[in-house]
Amino acid sequence: MRYLNQSEAQNIDQELFNEYAFSVDQLMELAGLSVAVAISKAYPRTGDGERLLVCSGPGNNGGDGLVAARHLKMFGYQPEIYYPKRPNRTLMNNLVTQCEKMEISFLTDLPSAQEMNFKYRLVVDAIFGFSFKGEVRAPFDDVLKTLKNVKIPLCAVDVPSGWDVEKGNPEGIQPEFLISLTAPKLCANHFKGRFHYLGGRFVPDLLLKKYELELPDFPGTDPCVLLE
């Protein structure tokens, strides 16, 4: 299976939107569902109302996190969301409303690493995706410092936040769980955690062939697959 550089990942996204007529909310829904299913497989519920924290950023990766939180609530978990930089976009506002109507709490302040360890089963990093470049700015610089110190499982969506999409970041957060969306990015070569899933079962065959992705078979009707 071939891993994607940043420009290839961006090109595939644009082709899905422009040539294959997918909408942003369609792909976000499919991606977020695959994140939620993969988390439920890697970390099955051991009781009722297990608490999870989803940290969402201002872009589409953050939207994937909001969708995942909604599905995780439907799966019987109790997600809470930290979403400090909300863009004024109808899609994101709708996702927030959906979560609020499902009684998912939005936190005003980020808990400390110690508080997270005590309160939550795991934390989902849905802050930055493959389009991120440059320095991490406030408030997310402090968020990543906190996430680097948590002892509970950290679950990264597509690209661990703060990592170079191609080179990774040995000094950054080190998630236990990574779900690559569409196809793994080159930085996934530096992932040393326990669970690496591929999610987003929506890439048309013609696009798979064009980019020579050779993705593994998805089991049954699952939207995700555990990579070896």
UniProtKB/Swiss-Prot annotation:
Enzyme class: isomerase
Binding of (6S)-NADPHX, residues: 60-64, 129-135, 158
Sites where the protein binds K(+): 61, 125, 161
Reaction equations catalysed: (6R)-NADHX = (6S)-NADHX; (6R)-NADPHX = (6S)-NADPHX
EC number: 5.1.99.6
Ranges for domain YjeF N-terminal: 9-214
Keywords on record: Isomerase, Metal-binding, NAD, NADP, Nucleotide-binding, Potassium
SUPFAM superfamilies reported in the protein's UniProt record: YjeF N-terminal domain-like
Positions of transmembrane segments: none
Swiss-Prot/TrEMBL cofactor(s): K(+)
GO CC, one annotated term: mitochondrion
Cofactor remark from the record: Binds 1 potassium ion per subunit.
Taxonomy, superkingdom: Eukaryota
Function recorded in the entry: Catalyzes the epimerization of the S- and R-forms of NAD(P)HX, a damaged form of NAD(P)H that is a result of enzymatic or heat-dependent hydration. This is a prerequisite for the S-specific NAD(P)H-hydrate dehydratase to allow the repair of both epimers of NAD(P)HX.
PANTHER family: NAD(P)H-HYDRATE EPIMERASE (PTHR13232:SF10)
Record protein name field: NAD(P)H-hydrate epimerase
Phylogenetic placement of the source organism: Eukaryota, Metazoa, Cnidaria, Anthozoa, Hexacorallia
